[in-house]
Amino acid sequence: MQSQYPSAHAPTADEAMLWNREALPPGPGQEAVLRGITGEMADKGFVVANLDKLVNWARTGSLWPMTFGLACCAVEMIHAYMPRYDLDRFGVIPRASPRQSDVMIVAGTLTNKMAPALRRVYDQMPEPRWVISMGSCANGGGYYHYSYSVVRGCDRIVPVDVYVPGCPPTAEALVYGIMQLQKKIRRTGTILRG
């Protein structure tokens, strides 16, 4: 069986990091890239990297949500923060102030009276900011869709990045939604250019 590493010895931690899924396949092309990086390190003492990817990677590990619990979905959101699911392991730490958060989780039925408050809190969040709509009521009105006092989806008030379906969605569904948001952040550039 042929080794996936170019040398016969067991890889060091640094070598193993180079051979992840996004790396070049082993071969002359990869060796040329590695020689170029090694030469640049020897000449300058540093490597020029893509700042946008680095910042997006850092943001995915430190999402600070502003929890906007409006109804029964908020109970499932609380479950996601408890020891069984422990969102802290993903770097997701809830904040009480919108000025310190970059993600808003809208969980539950949004009424017409609450909609201006939701928009005000969203506007107070610093850029870049993301919104997760959690539950059928936040996604499209849910069970109360035809009520005169219910907004038929929070995406009519704020732009939504991830929709978590369910009535109420499970804590696992919220964790999956947060992981999908992390993927979205990694894929898109978020550094504002003037």
Curated annotation (Swiss-Prot):
Listed cofactors: [4Fe-4S] cluster
One of the record's GO cellular component terms: plasma membrane
UniProt function note: NDH-1 shuttles electrons from NADH, via FMN and iron-sulfur (Fe-S) centers, to quinones in the respiratory chain. Couples the redox reaction to proton translocation (for every two electrons transferred, four hydrogen ions are translocated across the cytoplasmic membrane), and thus conserves the redox energy in a proton gradient.
Coiled coil region boundaries: none
The protein's assembly and partners: NDH-1 is composed of 14 different subunits. Subunits NuoB, C, D, E, F, and G constitute the peripheral sector of the complex.
Keyword Iron in record: yes
Subcellular location: Cell inner membrane
Catalytic reaction annotation: a quinone + NADH + 5 H(+)(in) = a quinol + NAD(+) + 4 H(+)(out)
Free-text remark on how the cofactor is bound: Binds 1 [4Fe-4S] cluster.
Gene designation per UniProt: nuoB
Enzyme Commission code: 7.1.1.-
Main location: membrane
Binding site for [4Fe-4S] cluster: C72, C73, C137, C167
Top-rank taxon, per record: Bacteria
Protein name: NADH-quinone oxidoreductase subunit B
Keywords tagged on the record: 4Fe-4S, Cell inner membrane, Cell membrane, Iron, Iron-sulfur, Membrane, Metal-binding, NAD, Quinone, Translocase, Transport, Ubiquinone
EC category: translocase
Organism, scientific name: Granulibacter bethesdensis (strain ATCC BAA-1260 / CGDNIH1)
Family under the similarity heading: Belongs to the complex I 20 kDa subunit family.
InterPro entries associated with the record: NADH_UbQ_OxRdtase-like_20kDa, NADH_UQ_OxRdtase_20Kd_su
HAMAP family documented for this protein: NDH1_NuoB (MF_01356)
